[in-house]
UniProtKB/Swiss-Prot annotation:
It comes from Arabidopsis thaliana (Mouse-ear cress). It is found in: Cytoplasm. Its main location: cytoplasm. One of its GO terms (molecular function) is sulfotransferase activity. Belongs to the sulfotransferase 1 family. SUPFAM superfamilies: P-loop containing nucleoside triphosphate hydrolases. This is Cytosolic sulfotransferase 13.
Amino acid sequence: MTKSETTLSKLLVESELVQECEELLSSLPRDRSVFAEYLYQYQGFWYPPNLLEGVLYSQKHFQARDSDIVLASIPKSGTTWLKSLVFALIHRQEFQTPLVSHPLLDNNPHTLVTFIEGFHLHTQDTSPRIFSTHIPVGSLPESVKDSSCKVVYCCRNPKDAFVSLWHFMKNLIVKEMVGCTMEEMVRFFCRGSSIYGPFWDHVLQYWKESRENPKKVMFVMYEEMREQPQEWVMRIAEFLGYSFTEEEIENGVLEDIIKLCSLENLSKLEVNEKGKLLNGMETKAFFRKGEIGGWRDTLTPLLAEEIDKTTKEKLIGSDFRFFC
């Protein structure tokens, strides 16, 4: 197929998908939100129309391979950092120390590891292919569920994830956010009406899947990774079948990867300070503090209590607990 034929095919697929999504929206529950004019509930989770199109696209067209790696999370839970770490550990033989020409120095992690719900034809030829997703586990494409591909899910404390989402949406200057108070956004967040929400359902379903199918899904906590990066990068590498050798560890390969992928280092790179993604989004929007417990600088005690109350209610009957 020629390049022009491929482009035409892609446009036809997208056109059909937009029409299908418009027809579907009329039958779905909807809720006003600060994240978009309306969010629509599909398979138990809430999406603005453009993100729902991406979910439908992936469900219809994404074909997973047994060697694929899928990095999953709900937004603002360490996605960017996880992408950089996994990309670096998988490709460490190609880009060895000194890391003076590593792709992460000139490319944002979201450029190197794309979303399966993105509008592209998933034509990566390299193996393993690395993708990311915010799609809930129950809505993943059937090919992901049926194949032997590996899924790594990153979870973050809901208060820190909320604050990160708040700043992210403000930076994007989403029109629905104009004049929105944090109190309003907390209310939407706690009732589940946020992008890919309810937050707690998203986390718990992946956690349950990781316990029922531990060879398929690995569940990691952002906070534990921040506190013990070497241990968790080694665990992830082992889960994916790319364990570090003793020689690599002695030669500082693991340490170099962690330094390269640190949020402090990535945020200072020109590509992440001044760059833009293909959709026009500024790359600097993906980097803030990334601190554990940073919510204390933003949330009032009452708002923190409201999120904690929802968390307690959502975890009834489960032995899962968030970090801090």
